[in-house]
Amino acid sequence: SINTKFSVDDGETITVPDGIAHYLEHKLFESEDGDAFVRYAQTGANANAYTSFEKTCYLFSCTEKFDESLEILLDFVQSPYFTAQTVAKEQGIIGQEIKMYDDAPDWRVMFNMLENMYHNHPVKIDIAGTVESIAEITAEKLYEVYNVFYNLNNMVLCVSGNVTVDKVLKTADRLLKSSEKHTIHNVFENEPYEIVKPYVEQEFSVSMPIFNLGFKEKADCVKGDAQAAHTDILLFLLASETSELYRKLLDANLINSSFSYELFDGPGYCSVIFGGESREPQKAAEMIKDYIVKLKENGIDKEEFEIAKKSIYGDTVASLNSVDTISNILADYHFKGNNMFDYIDEIANATIEDVTKRLDCMLDVNNCTLSVVKPIQDGEK
């Protein structure tokens, strides 16, 4: 969704409406031959798709007729069919989806935070766009975006499960059409390191306040498997359910089981987010920031480091028991230029000094923003 300004090879910069990647995902399931979901129903496969900030994924799972389902996938993603009538029909559907997300407190608390964090980067814009931006989408613009990004050189096929490589390659070689290789340049405006504003709140129909505390990082803060592994260990020892910070927040009745944390990064953006429900979100945010300051002053406890390292290693290896997770991880790592098995090795080989370096260059308490969604006050409903 963030690729709304781009150029191809050495051409001019092209600007397309916000939300067009998500719109294209919806429309690609339709073709002159019918709906791809109807075709999947005939093979018994469970199909879906999603658009994130940096990629669109089309997926299916099945227990039988894998070859037929793979043929459906490889066929419809290469067979766009857009007309003025079908595009106009979709605008109402996606418009309702946008309004639905506008009424979702978890969604709003995150995007309010991103708007407070990023001056120019399009990551602050809703993946689905706005009702106004999708009104600008035409069949011609969909074809333009499709022809640039839906190129085999910009795509990856990830398969996991009880199937052989030879079987997959045989189907792929038969159905995939050769593509001329182009270089796609994403165009982002200069993004300052500093946040926009330190605080934002919005009233919602919620029973308890929800907060997101976001620490803005440099865009290239986490590069490669080693830095990714060291960052994951750092965040686990900082805020997992076994951490001292988590226990302090819980004992102070400032969080509940909804509390979470994540590294949120992609092309041109990077941040660390803590969030969940809290009766006193400002106090929770202050406790998190104070703990980070003390951790930087006092250093990382060796025992806590070892627990975090072993936990991240175990969780990562255990995740490989899920075929769904494997496929998603493979796709994520491919587009980031990382390798899943190298990442696991980096976890195993991580030292407390490696993780301390991550701590020293991240989590600037003077460059964070707090977003709060709070209950509507009496008399304002």
Where are the model-predicted features located?
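His/Glu-rich zincin catalytic helix
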Residues: 1-35, 143-248, 285, 369-381
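M16 family metallopeptidases and their MPP-like homologs
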Residues: 1-7, 19, 35-76, 110-132, ...
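Acidic/histidine-enriched alpha-helical segments
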Residues: 11, 80-99, 184-193, 290-319, ...
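A residue-level signal for conserved active-site and pocket-lining positions in enzyme catalytic cores
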Residues: 94, 142, 213, 312, ...
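Short, low-order "capping/linker" segments at domain edges
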Residues: 99-103, 197-208, 313-324
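Active-site glycine-rich loop that binds ribose-phosphate moieties when present
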Residues: 135-145
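Generic recognition of flexible, low-complexity loop/linker segments
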Residues: 143-146, 200, 260-262, 356-360
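Bilobed periplasmic-binding protein-like "clamshell/Venus-flytrap" ligand-binding domains
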Residues: 356-372
